[in-house]
């Protein structure tokens, strides 16, 4: 059994429902959430101006799938929930990122683990710290040693319901 850490985000439609639906659909894909952070509301980072705020959460999942299969499952769930990829860092109904997968380091065009920008984003780091108070990446980086700007991030809802 493998552990994949996923970041979830949504800023269009019923944002909270989209996050919960993603958890439920991922379980049907064999990527079952075993822990969830609280849901955080965060200001958009990058992308077009005047985007609505995001809801974000981090989930720990267990799966028999490999990292590429987990990414494929995330992409299928995004498509099922209406995700379109028209504008880089634009608004979206759902975004699911593979942040970590066991202690694996992957550096390929279609998949990079650890996620290359996860340590720069409060909407990833703050929820991740709820699940692991002192996470250490496969390359030895301690997240607590990094300066992350928490401005614009605020708790919004309790953890997502696990399947």
Residue ranges and their predicted role:
Residues 1-31, 37-43:
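N-terminal beta1-alpha1 ligand-phosphate binding loop
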Residues 30, 35, 39, 45-54, ...:
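Flexible, gly/pro- and Lys/Arg-enriched active-site loops
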Residues 63-66:
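Helix N-cap motif at beta-to-alpha junctions
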């Amino acid at each position: 059994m493998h552990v994949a850490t996923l970041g979830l985000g949504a800023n269009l439609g019923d944002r909270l429902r989209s996050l919960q639906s993603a958890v439920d659909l991922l379980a049907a894909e064999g990527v079952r959430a075993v822990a969830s952070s609280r849901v955080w509301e965060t200001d958009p980072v990058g992308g077009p101006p005047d985007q609505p705020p995001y809801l974000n959460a981090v989930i720990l999942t267990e799966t028999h799938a490999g990292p590429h299969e987990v990414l494929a499952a995330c992409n299928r769930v995004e498509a099922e929930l209406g995700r379109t990829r028209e504008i880089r860092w634009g608004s979206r109904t759902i975004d699911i990122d593979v942040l970590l997968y066991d202690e694996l380091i992957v550096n390929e065009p279609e998949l990079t683990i650890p996620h290359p920008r996860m340590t720069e984003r409060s909407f990833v780091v703050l929820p991740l710290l709820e699940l692991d108070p002192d996470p250490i990446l496969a390359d030895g980086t301690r997240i607590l040693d990094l300066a992350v700007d928490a401005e614009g991030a605020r708790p919004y809802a309790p953890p997502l319901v696990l399947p």
